[in-house]
Structure formats: C-alpha cells, structure tokens
C-alpha cells in the first residue's frame, strides 16, 4: 500500500478517529482557534415520556461534535439535559435533526440568557486542605483581562516553595474544569489565574489534595472580590450592520435606543440606503 496525499481544501476520509470534531488538528497540525461566535441562550430539553435520557444525551453529544456552536450540558443534580446555542433558528434545526436521524421527538422550554462572570480588580485567593493524613495549600492571584480574552492560567512560584510536579498538578486542576462565579454561578471569563505560592507535606500530601486546595483557592478569591464589590456580571451582546431606506433611519435608531443598544453615526450609500 502507498501513502495517499491530499492538498488543502480537498475532501478525504480518515478511519480510527474517536474524539474528532470540527477544528481538531491531526498529527503536527494545531487545533484551530475557538469559534468567534459562542452560544448566548440555554434551553432545557424536554424528552417524550418514557424516553431514555442517557441515550438521548449520547445522540446530542454526537450532534455536538459536528456543530462547534452547539454545547450540550448534563445537569446531574436535576437529571436534565440543557443545550446552549445561538437562537430559535438553530433550535429548529436541532429539533429536525433529532427527528430525522434518531426518530426522537423533543421539545424545548423557554430559553434563558447565558451570562458570564469576571472580576474588575486583582485579588489573591488561598485554599487550605488538611483533613486527617492529607495536606495541601495553594495561593492564587486572580487578575481581570480585556473582554474576549477568556481564561488564562500560569505559574509564578519558586520550586523551593513548591515542587515543579505539584505546580504542574495545580495548573492541571485549574484547566480541567469550568470554574463558576459567586454572583449567580455563571462561568468565569476574561481572567488570568496565576499560582504564586503553595505548600505540600512530604508524608501526607496526595494528588487529590491539591485538587481540593486549588478549587478552594479560586472560590475564596472570588468571595473576597465579591465582598469588596469587585465582581461583575457579563451579558452577551451583538454587533451587526443594519441597512434601511433613508426615510426609515429615524425609526431604526429609535428602536435600537429603546432596546438599550448603541450605534455609530449613519452612513449613506450611493443607492440611498442608510
């Protein structure tokens, strides 16, 4: 058998992939950047009576792999499936796909806005975990970042204070989950979390101890920021271009302002459109 080469833009088939999705890099190729658009609404999936919720969850996850702008969330506490997407059109497409591919007739409840949380001032959080025969302590610096930066993690800790292996473990625990804020429990964003200090015990420290200490340090830092009014709730917003006839520009501007929007000065095109 000989190797087969494809040029950029050509379509080919690859076997043996188990966790591939749009944007995944193969071999030396890096994964593509995150989608520019992120879901802004969340809906609860209402399954038919008697339907297997876990089987439905698996089917939704398969569709999620095909569509990067669809996020499927399993709420273990409530035993509910939630989908996060852009709006009603995508919702109708999802409903149609589930019916056509899997014969699954689902409904969705009224959607809710996907808020996020951040901080407005740098603060330090400390997490201490010391039950019997366990020990770990983590000091984190939480800093705000410009809008659209997402979450960033780093370490600035001396090895004399905390061994490099433990430092890497703390970073792993920071990156492995979606951290939630303390205002409404929304996901954190636009924040840098840096490991600045930590302690371990030669005899009693185990890997799971640093997971607990790390999560507690994040939480404690957020609680401290909230006490001094340095936490902030973020809501999604849209940037778009609106083209209307010149005689309708006043009404359009009034409607945008009425919905708490803002706009740049209007521009008139040669055909009279504004």
For each feature predicted by the language model, list its residue ranges.
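Accessory interaction regions appended to the cores of large information-processing enzymes
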Residues: 2-274
């Amino acid at each position: 058998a000989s190797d087969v080469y494809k040029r950029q833009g050509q379509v080919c088939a690859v076997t043996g992939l188990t966790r591939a999705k749009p944007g995944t890099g193969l071999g030396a190729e890096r994964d593509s950047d995150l989608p520019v658009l992120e879901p802004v609404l969340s809906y609860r999936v209402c399954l038919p009576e008697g339907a297997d919720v876990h089987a439905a969850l698996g089917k939704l996850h398969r569709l999620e792999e095909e569509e990067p702008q669809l996020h499927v969330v399993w709420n273990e506490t409530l035993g509910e499936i939630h989908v996060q997407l852009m709006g009603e059109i995508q919702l109708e497409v999802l409903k149609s796909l589930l019916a056509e591919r899997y014969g699954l007739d689902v409904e969705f409840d009224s959607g809710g806005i996907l808020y996020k949380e951040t901080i407005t001032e740098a603060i330090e959080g400390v997490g201490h975990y010391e039950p019997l025969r366990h020990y770990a302590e983590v000091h984190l610096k939480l800093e705000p970042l410009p809008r659209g930066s997402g979450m960033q993690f780093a370490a600035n800790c001396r090895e004399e204070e905390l061994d490099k292996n433990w430092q890497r473990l703390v970073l792993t625990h920071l990156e492995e989950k979606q951290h939630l804020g303390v205002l409404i429990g929304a996901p954190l964003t636009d924040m840098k979390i840096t490991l600045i200090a930590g302690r371990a015990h030669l005899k009693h420290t185990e890997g799971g101890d640093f997971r607990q200490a790390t999560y507690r340090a994040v939480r404690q830092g957020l609680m401290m920021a909230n006490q001094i009014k340095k936490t902030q709730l973020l809501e999604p917003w849209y940037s778009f271009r609106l083209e209307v006839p010149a005689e309708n520009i006043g009404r359009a501007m009034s409607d945008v302002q009425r919905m708490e929007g803002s706009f740049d000065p209007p521009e008139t095109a040669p055909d009279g459109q504004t």
